[in-house]
From Swiss-Prot:
Residues 36-155 form the MARVEL domain. Residues 1-12, 175-184 have a biased composition (Acidic residues). PROSITE patterns: MARVEL. The gene is Cmtm3. It is a multi-pass membrane protein. It comes from Mus musculus (Mouse). Residues 1-22, 163-184 are annotated as: Disordered. This is CKLF-like MARVEL transmembrane domain-containing protein 3. The chain crosses the membrane at residues 64-84, 96-116, 131-151. Its main location: membrane. It is found in: Membrane. Belongs to the chemokine-like factor family. InterPro entries: Marvel, MARVEL-CKLF_proteins.
Amino acid sequence: MWPPDAEPEPDPESAHGPRSGRTVPGLRALLPARAFLCSLKGRLLLAESGLSFITFICYVVSSASAFLTVPLLEFLLAVYFLFADAMQLNDKWQGLCWPMMDFLRCVTAALIYFVISITAVAKYSDGAYKAAGVFGFFATIVFAIDFYLIFNEVAKFLKQGDSGNETTAHRTEEENSNSDSDSD
């Protein structure tokens, strides 16, 4: 445990290299699982972070840096949520409402990207601004798809919870009405 031993035990595999069936631990443990990256949520988060980074680079190259903060912030948030979902931090930190945070992140990103993309395309004639505006529109679409899917999942979850409460409430009412009729 901690503190580490002065002399760690020798690894029997170190002389021969790792076995064919086992992976080498280390920085690979921080990489997201392939199954998550191939899922719809993983692909959306990868697209969000990629488009945010490209938009950020386009604004860096352009002459004014008024819109530089939004793509950088959204890139960092998308990478954070990608890492959090891949490492299943939402299961470990139950106190945070992860779907609501992700939903608010996507809604605000879609709205802000839409506004700055319209401004960049309409107001500036620089090619980097035009490219940033186009990538911003693509990012708006990806963020909108993500918040639509999150909204549907949350609505389905809440609907299932309400139907479960209604059936137990209905059963309780039936039991109370049956017990009242028996006592008369």
